[in-house]
UniProtKB/Swiss-Prot annotation:
It comes from the Bacteria. One of its GO terms (biological process) is phosphoenolpyruvate-dependent sugar phosphotransferase system. InterPro entries: HPr (IPR050399), HPr-like (IPR000032), HPr-like_sf (IPR035895), PTS_HPr_His_P_site (IPR001020), PTS_HPr_Ser_P_site (IPR002114). Phosphorylation on Ser-46 inhibits the phosphoryl transfer from enzyme I to HPr. The keyword Metal-binding does not apply. The gene is ptsH. It is found in: Cytoplasm. Belongs to the HPr family. It comes from Listeria monocytogenes serovar 1/2a (strain ATCC BAA-679 / EGD-e). The lineage of its organism: Bacteria, Bacillati, Bacillota, Bacilli, Bacillales. This is Phosphocarrier protein HPr. The active site is at H15.
Amino acid sequence: MEQASFVVIDETGIHARPATLLVQAASKYSSDVQIEYTGKKVNLKSIMGVMSLGIGKGADITIYTEGSDEKEAIEGLTEVLKKEGLAE
């Protein structure tokens, strides 16, 4: 299992557009990918799950990956979060 923690820096948090980008990125990997916020974990491949978390600016989030390409998945998702200016 791989994991990485981030602080959301986007002014509007993880709303529809960035949530869609994250779901699309997570869906490229065969590993299980989850995102955790305030103690609740959801499947990062589910747009409804991600949106249900209501992640705002300043939120501490953790992404977990587990499976055959877990390392590539965590690296790819980290790149998306940073490249899009969503989290650091």
